UniProtKB/Swiss-Prot annotation:
GO MF annotation terms: glutaminase activity
Gene Ontology BP term (one): glutamine catabolic process
Keyword Hydrolase applies: yes
Name of protein: Glutaminase
Species assigned in the record: Nostoc sp. (strain PCC 7120 / SAG 25.82 / UTEX 2576)
Pfam families, sorted: Glutaminase
Enzyme Commission numbers on file: 3.5.1.2
HAMAP family for this protein: Glutaminase (MF_00313)
C-alpha cells in the first residue's frame, strides 16, 4: 500500500490530510459488506478487495492511498462529463428540452420518464444519460467517440481508451437500456439511430480510469473547469454550475437525498465501485472499492466520504474551518 503519488512532477508533501485518508483506508479496508456488480459479466470478475482514496486540490497537490493506480471502467461517473459536453454543444436551454434535472426516487436503471414532459428525469440516471449522449455532436459514430475520448483527455491530462471486453459485455446484455432508448425515441427525446446512440453510451461507460484520474477530474470541476495539473480548460466554466447542481441533487441515484443530508457535496457514483466528489474551489475526492450497496453505490466509498465530510467540515451548509492551510488550499471559513 502506498500513501503518496508518483505521477509525473506533481507536488507531494506531508500533510494532516494524508493522515486522515490513511486512517480511513486502514479503518475500512477489512469491511466485507456489499457485493460486486454482476449484471455486467465483465464487472463480476473484479477483485472486491481493491480499495483506494485519492484527493487532488485545486492548486495541484495530491494525496492518495491504496490501489490508486488500478484501472477500472468509469461506468456511470461518465454521465457527468457527457452532460457537460452536451451543454457545450447545445446550451442549457436546448438540453433541458431533452433531459430534465429532477431527482427521482427510482432505481438508476428504471424504465420511466416524466409523465408530463416525457423527458428522462435527469442526466445521472441511465435514461437521461443515453439521451444526453445522443446529443453529442459529430459527423459520424467515430467522430463522436473521438470527441468523447478527447473530452476525457482534457479532464484527466492523458489519453484514455475503451475496454473492448467491457463494452461488448454491456452491449450484449444492455436490454433495459435498449428499452429505455426505444421509449425515448417514441416520445421524441432521441432522434438518432438507437444502436448508434447506445454504442456511444456503452463506450463512454467502458473508458478506463484509475482513482487518481477520478480525483483529477473532480478537482477540474472544483477548479471551474480548469485541470489543476495541466492548466487546460476541460469544460466551459459557464456550465460548472449546471453540472455540479445536477450532481448534488441526482448524482447518487436514489440515495441522493441522504447523501446531500450527510455528506453535502456534489458527487457521482458508478457500479464500477467508484465515487467522485467535488468540493468547489477546494478539491476533488475519489474513492474506489467495488462492493456495492443495494442502491449501486460503493459501500466503502460512501463511508469514507461521510467521514471526510464530517472530519474536514466539507458539507456545503457547514460554516467552519477546514484546515490550517498546511495542505495548500488554505482555510475554509465564513
Amino acid at each position: 500500500m502506498s500513501d503518496q503519488a508518483n505521477q509525473g512532477d506533481l507536488e507531494i508533501r506531508p500533510s494532516p490530510l494524508l493522515k486522515v485518508i490513511n486512517d480511513l483506508h486502514s479503518k475500512y479496508k477489512s469491511l466485507k459488506e456489499g457485493i460486486v456488480a454482476n449484471y455486467i459479466p465483465e464487472l463480476a470478475k473484479v477483485n472486491p478487495d481493491l480499495f483506494s482514496i485519492s484527493i487532488v486540490t485545486v492548486d495541484g497537490q495530491v494525496y492518495q492511498v491504496g490501489d490508486y493506480q488500478q484501472l477500472f471502467t468509469i461506468q456511470s461517473i461518465s454521465k457527468v462529463f457527457a452532460y457537460g459536453l452536451a451543454l457545450e454543444d447545445h446550451g442549457r436551454d436546448y438540453v433541458l428540452t431533452r433531459v430534465g434535472v429532477e431527482p427521482t426516487g427510482e432505481a438508476f436503471n428504471a424504465i420511466i420518464l416524466d409523465e408530463q414532459s416525457k423527458r428522462p428525469y435527469n442526466p445521472m440516471v441511465n435514461a437521461g444519460a443515453i439521451a444526453t449522449t445522443s446529443l453529442i455532436k459529430g459527423a459520424g459514430a467515430t467522430e463522436r467517440l473521438n470527441r468523447v475520448l478527447e473530452m476525457f483527455r482534457r479532464y484527466i491530462g492523458h489519453d484514455v481508451f475503451v475496454d473492448i471486453s467491457v463494452f461488448t459485455s454491456e452491449r450484449s446484455t444492455g436490454h433495459r437500456n435498449r428499452a429505455m432508448a426505444h421509449l425515448m425515441l417514441n416520445f421524441g427525446m432521441i432522434d438518432r439511430n438507437i444502436e448508434e446512440a447506445l454504442d456511444l453510451y456503452f463506450q463512454q461507460c467502458a473508458v478506463m480510469v484509475n482513482c487518481h484520474d477520478l480525483a483529477v477530474m473532480a478537482a477540474t470541476l472544483a477548479n471551474r473547469g480548469v485541470n489543476p495539473i495541466t492548466g487546460e480548460q476541460a469544460v466551459n466554466s459557464r456550465y460548472i454550475k449546471d453540472i455540479l447542481s445536477v450532481m448534488y441533487t441526482c448524482g447518487m441515484y436514489n440515495f441522493a437525498g441522504e447523501w446531500a443530508y450527510k455528506v453535502g457535496i456534489p458527487a457521482k457514483s458508478g457500479v464500477c465501485g467508484g465515487i467522485m466528489a467535488v468540493v468547489p474551489n477546494l478539491m476533488g475526492i475519489a474513492v474506489f472499492s467495488p462492493p456495492l450497496d443495494i442502491r449501486g453505490n460503493s459501500v466503502r466509498g460512501v463511508k469514507v466520504c461521510e467521514e471526510l465530510s464530517q472530519q474536514l467540515g466539507l458539507h456545503l451548509f457547514e460554516c467552519m474551518k477546514v484546515g490550517n492551510g498546511e495542505w495548500g488550499v488554505g482555510n475554509c471559513e465564513c
